[in-house]
Curated annotation (Swiss-Prot):
Protein name: Potassium channel subfamily K member 7
Tissues/organs with expression: Detected in embryo, eye, lung and liver. Weakly expressed in colon, testis, atria, kidney, intestine, bladder, uterus, ovary, salivary gland, thymus and brain stem. Not detected in brain, cerebellum, spinal cord, heart, ventricle, skeletal muscle, liver, placenta and pancreas. In the eye, highly expressed in the retinal ganglion cell layer and inner nuclear layer.
Organism: Mus musculus
Recorded family membership: Belongs to the two pore domain potassium channel (TC 1.A.1.8) family.
An example Gene Ontology molecular-function term: potassium channel activity
Cytoplasmic side: 1-10, 141-172, 254-307
Transmembrane segments: 11-31, 120-140, 173-193, 233-253
Glycosylation sites: 83
Cross-referenced PANTHER family: POTASSIUM CHANNEL SUBFAMILY K MEMBER 7, POTASSIUM CHANNEL, SUBFAMILY K
Highest taxon, organism lineage: Eukaryota
Cell compartment(s), UniProt: Membrane
Quaternary structure and partners: Homodimer.
């Protein structure tokens, strides 16, 4: 495959990506199609039964108009249920979570602006906030990556590992740490706190949040009629989890992207030719790495004067 032209490599990568998309669509169609059709038939049967029972006092046209209004409100995150103890969607904690979902591109979709002014503000806010967020993430990544790489460097020196092995061990350790602290542990907490949530749904929510998929079909404490203080506490906890978890996920992804195996795969699809100085910058060989970590045994002699 090394003899392929660059355009053929890109075409191969594109075809593999499209094939993966098609395979995912076929699997989801097979898994989700029957339950969706069953739910649709169940709703239609219940609606027909309700119309037959209350046809005299509630015409079908009025019922359809009422359901349409309820669904339109639900699309903007406005619930029509009588949860009087739950606060408004646009209180301060909910608004903070909404702005965080914009700046992190998570976009849970549980609420959306109704007014034209709100929609215009979201466009301007995202256009200015997303580049600022990317710059902040780049600065934090540059600051935190050396800190998280110190344990891996110590292990590499202790066990006399090759640079490629040390990088792989460091990436695996950081990935396992992020998976346990920001994926498994929050999922267990969510599973224990939210009674109507299974462990699979909790893991599904955590992964959807940290991967910025943000499907929004599950949101902790949303629509449960909780006391306002508990609801606000849950919103702030979710906000902190989203910000810290995304930063940890980006650090793990950056560590994996620097692996020699990953760089070799990326280089395979890049333009052929000799490696540039930028590719070689900061790369030490095994002998250089060993010399840089061993202190000299002999003291440094000062300048001698001629006799």
């Amino acid at each position: 495959m090394g003899s392929l032209k660059p355009w053929a490599r890109y075409l191969l990568l594109l075809m593999a990506h499209l094939l993966a998309m098609g395979l995912g669509a076929v699997v989801l169609q097979a898994l989700e199609g029957p339950p969706a059709r069953h739910l649709q038939a169940q709703v239609q049967a219940e609606l027909a039964s309700f119309q037959a029972e209350h046809r005299a006092c509630l015409p079908p046209e009025a019922l359809e108009e009422l359901l349409g209004a309820v669904l339109r409100a639900q699309a903007h995150g406005v619930s029509s249920l009588g949860n009087s103890s739950e606060t408004s969607n646009w209180d301060l904690p909910s608004a903070l979570l909404f702005t965080a979902s914009i700046l992190t591109t998570t976009g849970y979709g549980h609420m959306a602006p109704l007014s034209s002014g709100g929609k215009a503000f979201c466009v301007v806010y995202a256009a200015l906030g997303l580049p600022a967020s990317l710059a902040l993430v780049a600065a934090l990544r540059h600051c935190l990556l050396p800190v998280f790489s110190r344990p891996g460097d110590w292990v590499a020196i202790r066990w006399q590992l090759a640079p490629a092995q040390a990088a792989l061990l460091q990436a695996a350790g950081l990935g396992l740490l992020v998976a346990c602290v920001f994926m498994l542990l929050p999922a267990l907490v969510l599973w224990g706190v939210q009674g109507d949530c299974s462990l699979l749904e909790a893991i599904y929510f955590c992964f959807g949040s940290l991967s910025t998929i943000g499907l929004g079909d599950l949101l902790p404490a949303h629509g449960r009629g909780l006391h306002p203080a508990i609801y606000h506490l849950g919103q702030f906890a979710l906000l902190g989890y989203l910000l810290l978890g995304l930063l940890a996920m980006l650090l793990a992804v950056e560590t994996f992207s620097e692996l020699p195996q990953v760089r070799a795969m990326v280089k395979f699809f890049g333009p052929s030719g000799s490696r540039t100085d930028e590719d070689q910058d900061g790369i030490l060989g095994q002998d250089e790495l060993a010399l840089s970590t061993v202190l000299p045994d002999a003291p440094v002699l000062g300048p001698t004067t001629p006799a």
